[in-house]
């Protein structure tokens, strides 16, 4: 994720529960008086959770909020109180932004504390320096727990640098020996290392064993904090053109059983092909679908390692991931967040029969779904509606992940600036019940948007209506 700027339910629930209990008791008595060949009645293993008991997460992007929080515990206390008063139960505080530096303590070699982040200040994109010496993450933990909020650490995963007009940051810029960690993209000009492509976020190659070890070691240090959960963001490949390094080529050929791909990379993906090109293909190159399967396995295996790393330090920390809800095209970044019980190949031509095996939902304690639809598309059953994203996510995860929460990006949802402010405000209100009714919780990105447009009251109205 990235920030850009430009009723009567409780009574019904209790009544329904009482009917279930009474019916179960009567059937128990009948069964006790009957023979073995009587009817076998089955009942749901769980009773639907009331919305009031479902978590409501708000994400706190590091860069976007840095001007407020980098050096002020008072501002942290102020805004966490606003989140609590609005009805949010959980915060996700970003402590490893896209440059790959950190806002907590770690002894892993090569890791560095964030010195500055680029943020919009009074209409100008500027450097915001961190001069405070107190522990950034610990400040959120202390105040969050004091307020009764659960505190999760948001962790940008497969990133190692960021270059902009303000300057370059991250281990990939600081240490030239780590260039092989950077992803190599299949461009029209040839396979090119990310560090030779100019500015922007620099992704690691997820298939690189050294990268995986580096990330897992950092996660172990993060797990030493008294946090309630860890949410991995960008736990993925950089895009459809990634990764075509020799490291990944050899691993893929081994995955194929030792096959040598003669026309590399065109037998997988034509040089420079984009997602638009891929989605327009009537037939795929020879190894394309197997390549998608392989990439999904790479991410599955990494997620298993990351979970083990966290749990080895503190088994009580909830391990989670943020993903985009657009599953139909999320193969672009090599991620299968569904359950292995969801047979992807039955629905999508790009999926092999074995693609489903690398759905990682069962590895998670919590899954945040970006239900990033337009404010004009809150309700529905399909992708690109908020409610549809959440319903589909629950179906695809098949109960493997016990907590699936989804919700909107309330700042980047109207790229054409065609929706009125009143409609946006109403969409925030409506989004809460639309998403919470469809899954296990609500998730809003990002705190900065509620602050900038003074929209806390609409989030509160939506939460109050959803849980009444």
Regions inferred by a protein language model and the residue ranges of each:
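Substrate-binding cleft of secreted/luminal carbohydrate-active enzymes
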Residues: 354-468
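Bacterial Sec-dependent N-terminal signal peptides
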Residues: 25-53
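Substrate-binding cleft/loops of secretory-pathway carbohydrate-active enzymes
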Residues: 160-163, 240, 313, 318-377, ...
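Catalytic domains of carbohydrate-active enzymes, especially glycoside hydrolases
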Residues: 74-101, 225-229, 356-369, 438-442
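Aromatic- and acidic-residue-enriched segments that line the glycan-binding/catalytic groove
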Residues: 103-117, 159-195, 235-278, 332-343
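Aromatic-lined carbohydrate-binding/catalytic grooves of carbohydrate-active enzymes
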Residues: 88-132
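Glycine-rich, aromatic-flanked loop segments that form ligand/cofactor-binding clefts
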Residues: 90-99, 136-195, 231-234, 315-320
